[in-house]
Amino acid sequence: MAKKRISIMVVDDNDMMRTILRGVLRGEEYEVVGEARNGTIAVEMADRLKPDIICLDVIMPEKNGLEALCEIKAARPETEVVMITSNADPETVQEAIQNGASGFIIKPYNAARILNTLEKICERIRQRLA
C-alpha cells in the first residue's frame, strides 16, 4: 500500500527561501499545497487548506511566525508546525515549543536536515492516523 502524500504549506516572506524549500520537497512523499509570505495569510490559508504540516518562518512582516503559530494551533491543534529561523535563540525556541511547534529548521536550509525533521513528523502523523 502506498504511503499517503503529506500535505505541506510553506510560509516565508523571502521568495527565494520558499522556492528552495519547495524544491527540496519536490519528488518526495510531500505535496506543497500552498505558500504564504506572511503570518496573516498563513493563518487564513491554514484554515482553508488544512495542511498536515506547515513550515513557518519566525521573522515576517504583518504577523510573525510565533503569532501565527498560536492562531493556527488554536484553530487546528492537529496541524504539525515546523518553525524556520536564521536565529534560534533559546527564548524563541522555548516560546515556540510551549505554543505547539513540532520542530525547528535553521536557515540556511540543509536538505538532509529538512527531510529528516519532516520524516520524524510524518511518522507521528501516520501513527495518529493508523
Residue map of PLM features:
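Two-component/phosphorelay signaling modules centered on CheY-like receiver
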Residues: D15-G34
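Acidic catalytic/metal-coordinating carboxylates
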Residues: N38-I41, N64-E67
